[in-house]
Amino acid sequence: MALKIRLARGGSKKRPYYHVVLADARSPRDGRFLENLGSWNPMLAKDDEKRVQLNAERIKHWIEHGAQPTDRVLRFLDEAGVAKREVKNNPVKAKPGKRAQERAAEKAQKVADAAAAAADAAE
């Protein structure tokens, strides 16, 4: 059974509240879970100590037994010092797309042509 440590949504409409749960990867998001491992209340201030509450001992136990935390839960665990999250580096992401690069090249060519024409006219 593939186990995941993930978020299960609770709360009402526009007032989210999440439980950090251990669940089978195939079960629904808010469906059956094996153990409740903590909570996250995004409505609280970021510096509030009750915003993220984790049972670190049980989380370590389940990670040792093969449970995989989701990306968001892994961020919480990294902040709490329970697990290490690898920093993702994608330098290609910042580059514009192919069409945008073509348009920029065309625009630069037009500017260069206009500058050359102005220089010829000035002579």
Swiss-Prot record:
The record, for InterPro entries, names: Ribosomal_bS16, Ribosomal_bS16_dom_sf
Residue span of region Disordered: 87-123
What UniProt keywords are attached to this protein's entry? Answer: Ribonucleoprotein, Ribosomal protein
UniProt xrefs under Pfam families: Ribosomal_S16
Q: Where is the composition biased (Basic and acidic residues)?
A: 99-110
Quote the biased-composition stretches of kind Low complexity, using this chain's numbering. 111-123
GO annotation, biological process: translation
Gene Ontology CC terms, in alphabetical order: cytoplasm; small ribosomal subunit
**One GO molecular-function entry:** structural constituent of ribosome
Alphabetized HAMAP family for the sequence: Ribosomal_bS16
Provide the family line: Belongs to the bacterial ribosomal protein bS16 family.
Q: Which protein are we looking at?
A: Small ribosomal subunit protein bS16
The species this protein was found in: Rhizobium johnstonii (strain DSM 114642 / LMG 32736 / 3841)
Organism placement in taxonomy: Bacteria, Pseudomonadati, Pseudomonadota, Alphaproteobacteria, Hyphomicrobiales
Gene symbol of the encoding locus? rpsP
